[in-house]
């Protein structure tokens, strides 16, 4: 990624800023119907300024690592790397803003890991939900070893099983009331990031209903960061 960024320095790279402090570097343009200023407006209207202090910047381009992993965004090395969505149908400013919010959550987790997880409450809520889902799937005829769901070394295998063996569409029908989305099942990091995304740019009331402990943690952190208790 760094080499790709360096090679673009002499080209027509565009720069924007969030809250006049966090740079957005556009190495490859979004599709014509996407308005970068509208994305910035969404982010500035709904995401607290302090959250952008967790990153050094946002890079938008055609990054091989994103393509290889079949993902649209990634938090890495204190920055967010985002696809330019040149081949994506149905993409909107709202979708892109949510992708950024999701990666901001990973940046927040990187900086505030102790504050988020020290009391094990989120972990217990997350694991309790996975136990319920495992019971539902076994009742439905799936033979699933428990270690697939609860081993930190098998996160990729679990993701592959959920996506290919069961399918996200089917999981969406099984998991209402348990998880915000099938993607949040795979790891506690994704459970947390999906929660932050919903808290900031979705429906906080839905998060509070589905994941009350996660919601309360975010509400507490939000208040502490705004008041300066953690700065």
Over which residues does each language-model region extend?
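Short, conserved micro-motifs enriched in small and acidic residues
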Residues: 91-95, 99, 187, 191
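Catalytic Zn2+-binding segment of zinc metalloproteases
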Residues: 97, 103-123
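C-terminal or late-domain output modules
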Residues: 1-28, 38-41, 62, 78-79, ...
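Auxiliary, metal-adjacent structural segments of Zn-dependent hydrolase domains
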Residues: 12-80, 84-94, 118, 136-149
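Long, hydrophobic, amphipathic alpha-helical segments used as structural scaffolds
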Residues: 51-54, 111-116, 204
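Non-catalytic architectural context of zinc metalloproteases
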Residues: 1-31, 59-65, 159-176, 181-183, ...
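Pan-zinc metallopeptidase signature
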Residues: 154-231
């Amino acid at each position: 990624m760094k080499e790709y960024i360096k090679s673009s320095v002499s080209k027509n790279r565009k720069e924007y800023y969030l809250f006049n402090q966090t740079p957005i570097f556009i190495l490859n343009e979004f599709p014509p119907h996407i308005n970068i200023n509208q994305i910035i407006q969404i982010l500035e209207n709904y995401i607290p300024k302090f959250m952008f202090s967790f990153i050094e910047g946002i890079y938008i381009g055609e990054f091989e690592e994103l393509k290889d992993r079949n993902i649209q965004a990634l938090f890495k090395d204190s920055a967010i790397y985002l696809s330019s969505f040149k081949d994506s149908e149905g993409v909107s400013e709202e979708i892109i803003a949510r992708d950024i919010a999701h990666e901001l959550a990973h940046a927040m987790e990187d900086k505030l890991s102790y504050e988020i997880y020290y009391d094990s409450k989120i972990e217990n809520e997350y694991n309790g939900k996975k136990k319920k889902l495992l019971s539902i799937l076994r009742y439905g005829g799936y033979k699933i070893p428990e270690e697939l769901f609860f081993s930190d070394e098998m996160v990729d295998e679990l993701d592959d099983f959920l996506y290919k063996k069961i399918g996200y569409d089917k999981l969406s029908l099984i998991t209402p009331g348990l998880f915000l989305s099938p993607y949040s099942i795979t790891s506690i990091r994704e459970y947390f990031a999906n929660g932050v995304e919903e808290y900031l740019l979705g429906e906080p009331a839905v998060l509070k209903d589905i994941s009350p402990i996660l919601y309360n943690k975010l509400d507490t952190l939000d208040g502490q960061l705004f008041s300066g208790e953690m700065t």
